[in-house]
Amino acid sequence: MPTRRDVLKAGLLAPAAVAAAKQIPFDLANNAARPESDALVDDNALASAGPGAGRERLLLDFGWRFHFGHADDPNKDFGFGGPAVGNFQKTGNFMPACSIAYDDSEWKSLDLPHDWAVELPFQNDPDLLNKGFYPLGRKYPGTSVGWYRRVFDISAEDAGKRITIEFDGAYRETMVVLNGFYIGRHSGGYDPFSFDVTDFAYIGQRNVLLVRVDATESDGWFYEGAGIYRHVWLVKTNRLHVKKWGTFVKSQVRTGEASLSILTEVSNDGAASRNARVNSTVLDPSGQAVGKDTSPAASISAGDDQSYRQEIVVKRPSLWSLEERHLYKLVTEVQADGQVVDRYETPFGIRTAEFDAEKGLLLNGKAVKLKGTCNHQDHAGLGAALPDAVQYYRVGKLQEMGCNSIRTSHNPPTPELLDACDQMGMLIFDETRMMSSNPEGLSQFENLVRRDRNHPSVFMWSMGNEEGQANTARGGLILSAMKAVAKEHDGSRPVSIAPAGAIGTGGLEMCDVAGYNYMDPQAEEFHKKHPDKPVMGTETVSAVGTRGIYVTDRAKGFVSSYDPYTTTGRASAEGWWRFCNARPWLSGGFVWTGFDYRGEPSPYTWPNISSQYGIIDTCGFPKDSFYYYQSWWTEKPVLHIFPHWNWPGMEGKEIAVWAYSNLDRVELFVNGKSLGAKDIKKDSHVAWVVKYAPGSIEARGWKDGKLVMTAKRETTGAAAKLVLRANREGVSADGEDVTMFAVEVQDAQGRTVPITDNEVTFRVSGAGKLIGVGNGDPTDHASDKGTSRKAFSGFCMGLVQSLKTGGNITVEATSPGLASASARIAAKAVKLRPQVAVWEREVPSGAGVTGLWRPVLPTSGPANDFISMLIGINAVFTLRQEGSKLTGTVEGAAGFFGGDDVPAPIVEGTVDGDRVAFKSGSSDFKGAVKEDRIELQRSVNLPWESPKPPKEEPGRPAIGPAPDGSDPSIDVTWEVPSSIPVVLRRVER
């Protein structure tokens, strides 16, 4: 469909016309036009503005209001889709909630990111299995649609700029409306999208952004959340600017230097051709300039793009690797008419990454075995709406066990996950959601590639997951088209797919690296037949286990944590890694999964509401298998022994005791008596069978003949106290940062009580707030948004987010009968990143009628939409009484008579006892104060004369037209009353 740029490009809108055009929505009630700041500005004049024309990318996460809509009933969906509401009938006429004066006091206040699904109660409905038993979908229309509303200002200084609103992701069908103007829709729950709202933004005034999100449909078979669960941005640029994701740095590393091939795409959204050049500067990790280049000037037609290609050589580059995360920055300046009109920054890394069929992945020429995990994007207490700090927390937990790579199963990740991986040294196998060559599928994949191509952590593109068509000739056509997109917009990374039941056949031949899911024996056969093709385990293991549980109990939904427990006969952790690590040609693989996740409960369904595949539970508490991987994926000494040693009623019965370790030998002691030492074989564990007796089990680990580590489990006493630990010593007071507060239940001697389920309540004071709770129990149906949670296997967690004011955050954990615990961290005042200010209506305070007032519908009489329009039901009366004088404004009271939200001043306002009178716009208001309300009569000076009933005319037939041929429709025209009763009530916003 044609866009504004297409019109400009076609020359249908001349520059002179643009310069002269003005947006003038006429207000019949106030008989006034919008201020001149709303005029479109000739962007030839803008270039001379210099610094005022700079790019701004402002976070639009704070200060939203939210309300559920309805997928089936327009009356519960603010009239959307109803026959009487013409949302699409007239431009700029989209539903009352778009009015600034609209009363949203019953809407919930919140900040983004937001996932409303995790706030819902669980439902035991088999159809909800993959949604984690949250009520979403066609059967649950009342909880499947949400409306978001945000009021914000755009400065008058932004006149002439290009204004866009960017969404990093919303689940799933999103409709965007600005100032009553329908902007557009987006389908898909994971890829970013944006809208150019330049023509619809009110410059120098307040704006109302309305977003409807419909989560009825599903993309996946796992929990996906609902709502605007990623960041939203307001972006302001010159009409001549770097295109979104319009820079790409491709590096070629040679001895002592790196040659950077730089692509810059510049867009001209103005109405006239522009001559522009690009200045590129490369900054090293310390911020020093190490290379510069200026392109020749090139003419860019109106509505067109221009690509600039430059070469910069960096001497003695610092290469990005897993151990040394050196990040460079490309600073791009667009220059026109002697002024810099746009400045765009691109972080990137210099490194090489290639696959060798015999050595696997080579990073900077060094073989790196992929010790990877697949991960979905939800977390305890949060659902799918993860603050940035939680991305870093999750990457850190994976790195603790030696994981060096993540597969973003099964969708494009949030950009902040890639930032975390760039900065912390983690590789990314970047996956799209839809394997398709239809326009939507290719667009999603192109967005993924363009957005993520400068991240050094991204080493390969994934074109899909377990697609049955991939192994067919038709799949080959689809994958070929997708591969062409990757080559066009990147070309520096290979492509692959996580296939189902096949390796490298049919359409899978399109893959540069042969991926396979679970088929270890077939992978070996494939390598023998195709020794020149790199091979990688795109999905492996699928072992299951419940943290802290060692006896499988189907009724309770728990699975033993001993490693052999898998689903569908797939490999154990130890079985897969021993196979993988013994084959240098096998590039490594990605374990299913790093973290437990909601939905797809495995191996059991209700009461389970989450999977148990994770090596780590939903909170981030490690399971026992974590220490197997840590033993063989890291160089640090590891010794971990399990199970716990609290087994009342099991005296004299045999219990398997396992130890995970990478030491030379481990000796086991039971109640002080040695059961012998065992040698540790590579990539394996050691085990003993022990007859249970209360007391202790102790493992002693030896390396090079020396005792270097011990690990001990003891039979504990009853739960006596709580211990509270924060994962960080301090946070930034930016309203975004998050700290995990882990609660451990201990006995009187300070030992973790592993079989307790005490209810723990969190209280937060100071410069923070509680945003979620969790415990890793896959069967727990308590709300993640409550203030308390039961301990599970001795642990639970509270997630605390900072406020925007510096100070201390104090968290207290209490439980009946146990000693409480508290912890304090500092929230350091910081400079906030650029963001859109939160708009709040001023509430005047004072005597008499001073305050905010809104109309209410009459309790008797024709209380319908027509009357609502007449009285201006969404109006706001800001009244200020000083003695007998009444001043203030009336906003949005034009009602049926047209107009917008520009406040009209109150003039000639008086208060005499209980009587009030004032004028505003074209209306006179008179009435009396009655307890908690003001009863007024509104007299309107109409710009037209109301029709009068037809007169009796001699000779006019009872049926048929008048003899003079006059129009009889005047007989049924609405007669607008000249005086309307208006009742006001006092409000807080």
Regions found by a protein language model. Give the residues of each.
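N-terminal secretory signal peptides and thylakoid transit peptides that target proteins
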Residues: M1-P15
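Extended carbohydrate-recognition surfaces in non-catalytic/accessory domains of CAZymes
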Residues: F26-E166, D219, G225-I228, L240, ...
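Accessory beta-strand-rich segments of carbohydrate-active enzymes
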Residues: G50, E119-Q123, R138-W245, G270, ...
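N-terminal helix-cap/turn-to-beta initiation motif at the start of protein domains
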Residues: G52-L60, S99, W839-V856, R880-G883
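Extended substrate-binding grooves/exosites of carbohydrate-active enzymes
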Residues: E56, F62, F78, P83-P96, ...
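Beta-strand-rich binding/interaction modules
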Residues: S259-A297, A656-K673, I697-G701, T810
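Beta-strand-rich structural segments
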Residues: I262-E265, P643, V657-S661, R700, ...
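Beta-sheet ligand-binding and adhesion/scaffold domains
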Residues: V849-V876, T889, P905-R989
